[in-house]
Amino acid sequence: MLTVEKRIISRNFTRAGAGRKIEYIVIHYFGSLGTAAAVANYFAGADRQASAHYCLDEGNIVYQCVEDNNIAWHCGTSGGYVHPRCRNANSIGIEVRPYKLDKTTAGSAAARDWYFTEKTVDNLVEFTRALMEKYNIPAENV
């Protein structure tokens, strides 16, 4: 069973309030070899211009960085949007810890040897299902 530990950041997100409608869940991987706790700490740092609502790995703790009713900066606008309707304003972002076969290319998010442990995937499925139920999000919006 997963436990959510709040590590709410004080910057790098937008306050939205109770009226925010959550329609999507966006799943990312870190692009680095750090733990979920380390990435949560990274988001809390200076002017990152990025954040996610949650960070998880193979451990039993999910770190919450941004309250669900606020807007994390995870979908990106620097290169435009990929999805026609999913935006930071209507989604929850989850960052997931990857592993890498060739650690000498760890700085390359485009490398094709990133992978997830079975426990990490199990945690992600469990946590994503809980969010889907909480916000009535259909599978096609994940």
Regions inferred by a protein language model and the residue ranges of each:
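Active-site-adjacent loop/helix surface patches within enzyme catalytic domains
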Residues: 2-138
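Short glycine-rich phosphate-binding loop at a beta-alpha junction
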Residues: 140-142
